[in-house]
Every structure is written in structure tokens, then in C-alpha cells.
Amino acid sequence: MEPVLQARGKRENVLGNAREERCVPGFPSACEQKLEQEKLSGVVKRVHRDLRKKYREAGDFEKIWLEHCKDKGRLCEYAVAMKALADNHWAKKCEGEGRIEWCLGVCQEYFFNGGKKKAIEKDARRATLNKLQSPNHAEDGVSDFSVPNIKPLNDEYMTGKIRLLDVGSCYNPFLKYEDFLAVGIDIVPAVETVCKCDFLNLQIQRPLQFAPDAIDAFLKQLESPIDYLPAELFHVVVFSLLLSYFPSPYQRWICCKKAHELLTLNGLLLIITPDSSHQNRHAVMMKSWKIAIESLGFRRMTYSKFSHMHLMAFRKTSLKTTSDLITMNYPDMLYIPQDFNYDGEEDYFSPCCARSELEDEQLACGFTELPDTPYDSDSGESQNSTMPFYEFEDPILLLT
């Protein structure tokens, strides 16, 4: 037994010396970057974990959120860590296919390359078909939110800049693109170009009755902090790694509802949420999210799964929502795996999800993504699968 232990000890010493040699001159940057990334990721993970723990213990998400927003020191530490991760680690590993580039591509295709026109035309065909199938539908006075509001095709192409609101922006990555008039908001901004704003408690006012250039001027003069915004102000609202930050499904629901109010008709809600598992591991959860968000007056236009995240684009198809959304349990359908994890480590990069060592070190964000797999909600089929998706087979729906 002793020779075995001695041999094992020698082998471990050799491996240990090899690791040390990698940190000598010649390999310093890689070692330093890895250590820095571990430290920064730990800061972010602890904030998320502590929020969920407090919510499970107290159950009052409003009180917990207010206390969280008052912890300036920790919020500043979080903002600095997120910006450092984005600048020094995530951006270098995306190789041009990151979450920001995905948002840019979706917006360009939709607003400048005819995507919006095609979507509106499809709505018109769907409305005509529904009318033919239900001739007495309009006479009965029944409000059908599955039939989108049809708007004349006089604004299907964007003529000016895309007015974009980036919620939880941290460092306003969309500001560098000429296509966007970007407004970044965060509870604790990491840079001066981001306005301080608590989106959960943002007050929504009546829409502005201004010309487009006047609305652009209004956005350009916004100052921090932002406590209120007019409705129907933006063409795009982005939730990039935002919804999983909140410990309560109802908070995620509030965010999506506010996004619906802030978007113009046919505007886009882009949602990016972390997940390092394979594409089908949380397929039921993604279907549940789709149904819940569409109930607000959206229709999912695109879905993609990268190696570390889900990416979804929803189009606002109705100016109003139904009045009984809460009783239908839609808020609870915006769940994440961590909501049911009570065993301590509860983020997407925990060992129970069979992640690699490198993935365990990284926080819920995209690094080197796989090719995206667009999903057409209208057709019910994924481009990499011919199997249709029937919503009524979703176990979450059966439970609720």
C-alpha cells in the first residue's frame, strides 16, 4: 500500500510542479487572467446566491429588493466585476458571435431588411384566416389577444435610428453602434453613459405625442437618475442576463410587463438568459417562458441556443393585455432552475449540471457560442428539427 501512496504522491508533485511552471514567465498572463476571472465570477455569483437565499427565507421580494438597492458598496463591487468580466474575458472569447452581436443582427434583419414587413403581413393573413373560421367572432364582442393588432404597412421599414433601452446595462455596449439610439439603465451604473434606474419601480407615463425627431431629442436629454418614462417610447428593449438576476418569478413578470408598456407596437423585446447545459435540457422551461411572455401581448419571433445562453426575440403584437393574467399563473411560469435548488450552490454553473471546470468558473454569459438555431414561433418548427411543437403538451401548462 505504501509504494502506491508514494507513487501517487510523486505523481501529484510532478503535476503540481507542472502547474507552477505554467505560472512562471512565459505563461503569466494566462494564469493571472484565470485567477482574476475566478475572483470576479465569485463576486457576481455570491450576489445572486445571497438574493435567492434571502428571498427563500423571508418571501417578501419587495423588501429584499429595496434592501439590496440600498447596499451601495456591494452593488458597486458587482458593477465593477461585471464590467471587468465583459471587457477582459467575455469579449475576448466570443470571437464575434456574442450576445450583443446577436441583438444587433436580429434588429438589423427586422428593422432594415424586411423582417418587420414580413411579420406584419403574416399577422394580416392570420387575422383573415381567423375571421373566416369564426364569422361571428367580431359580433360576439369577444376580445381575442391571439390576433395581433394590424397596422398599415407604412412604417415597416426603419427610417431613423432604432430607439433601444438596455435594462441592466452596466456599461452600455450598444452605444457604439450607429444603428441605435441606445439608452442604458442600471441600479448602479459602471460607466457615466448609463443612467441610474430601478426598473422594477420605474413609473410608466402616457405616450409622448411627438414627431420621431422630437422623441429622439427627448431621449438624448435624459439624465440620471430616471424615475419615469413615457409608454410606447422604444423600438427595442433588451434584457441581457437580467431576468435570472431577480430571485422571484413575479419580479421577472413585472419586468416583461413594463417592457410591453415601453415598446411601440411591433417593437422587439430581446431576452438573453444564461444556461450552459445542452439545448434540450431546459426545453420545458423555455416553452413555459414563451407562453407566459406571449400572454402579455407578444409573439415570439426568434429563438437561439448558444453554448452558454438562451436568446429570444419577442414582437409586441397588441397594445393591451388581458386582465386576468395573474389568476392564470403566468408569472410563476417565468421560473429558473435556481428557484427550486435549495442545496447551497444554485447557479447555472454548479457541478450538478455536469459543467466543465472552465464553465464552473464563468458566470452565466456567452463566450464561444455554437451556431444559433432560429425558431419560428409562427410555423411551430425549429430550423434544425422538423418536429412541430404543440403548446398544449407542455407539462407546465398541464400543472397550472
Swiss-Prot record:
Keywords annotated in UniProt: Methyltransferase, S-adenosyl-L-methionine, Transferase
EC number: 2.1.1.-
Positions contributing to S-adenosyl-L-methionine binding: 99, 168, 186, 198-199, 240
Span of the signal peptide: none
Keyword set includes Transport: no
Residue ranges that the Swiss-Prot or TrEMBL entry lists as coiled coil: none
UniProt cross-references to HAMAP family, sorted A to Z: BMT2
Subunit structure: Interacts with the GATOR1 complex; interaction is disrupted when samtor binds S-adenosyl-L-methionine. Interacts with the KICSTOR complex; interaction is disrupted when samtor binds S-adenosyl-L-methionine.
Stated name of the protein: S-adenosylmethionine sensor upstream of mTORC1
